[in-house]
């Protein structure tokens, strides 16, 4: 983000470094990065839940991923992180600690604009749990491990899941 005239003057130089898109006034580039990270965090959660659902229902999660990856739900997240999850490969590409930092920044930015982002808030809480449990250096697809641990607990005020989401501790 920044002044449109300056952007136009420097666009060719910027193109030498990668894809260039003008997104608006100063600060808009940072918001675009946060928007990207919100999609990444939430989508890793969605991929995790989809694979857990497939497995719980008796379907082959690898086959389910293969079946849907070229459809409407297909995405780089399903391709890359779905594969990591299925291979149980949580060596860091993007660390849980970094995803948590981004989720905190997303929530702080939303608060500054007086908006509520419920999915981002829940994902932030889940990453807080992961980091508090000492798994901050794992790849952010390790969100799957926590969601899988929580899969048998319905979300109500007496459930373990509810307690975890509000007290941030689990065993």
Predicted segment positions?
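Rossmann-fold dinucleotide-binding core
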Residues: 1-41
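Helical "substrate-binding/catalytic lid" subdomain
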Residues: 28-150
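Long, positively charged, glycine-interspersed low-complexity recognition regions
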Residues: 158-160
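Intrinsic-disorder-associated, low-complexity terminal segments enriched in Asp/Asn/His/Tyr and depleted
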Residues: 166-167, 171
């Amino acid at each position: 983000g920044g002044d449109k005239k300056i952007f136009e003057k420097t666009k060719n130089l910027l193109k030498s470094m990668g894809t260039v898109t003008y997104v608006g006034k100063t600060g808009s580039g940072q918001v675009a990065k946060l928007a990207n990270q919100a999609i990444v965090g939430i989508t890793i959660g969605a991929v995790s839940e989809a694979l857990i659902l497939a497995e719980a229902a008796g379907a082959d999660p690898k086959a389910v991923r293969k079946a849907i990856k070229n459809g409407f739900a297909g995405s780089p997240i399903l391709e890359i992180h779905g594969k990591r999850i299925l291979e149980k490969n949580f060596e860091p590409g993007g660390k849980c600690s970094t995803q948590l930092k981004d989720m905190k920044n997303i929530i702080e930015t939303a608060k500054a604009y007086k908006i509520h982002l419920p999915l981002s808030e829940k994902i932030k809480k889940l990453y807080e749990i992961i980091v508090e449990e000492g798994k901050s250096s794992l790849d952010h697809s390790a969100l799957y491990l926590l969601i899988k641990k929580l899969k048998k607990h319905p979300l109500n005020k007496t459930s373990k899941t509810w307690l975890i989401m509000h007290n941030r501790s689990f065993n």
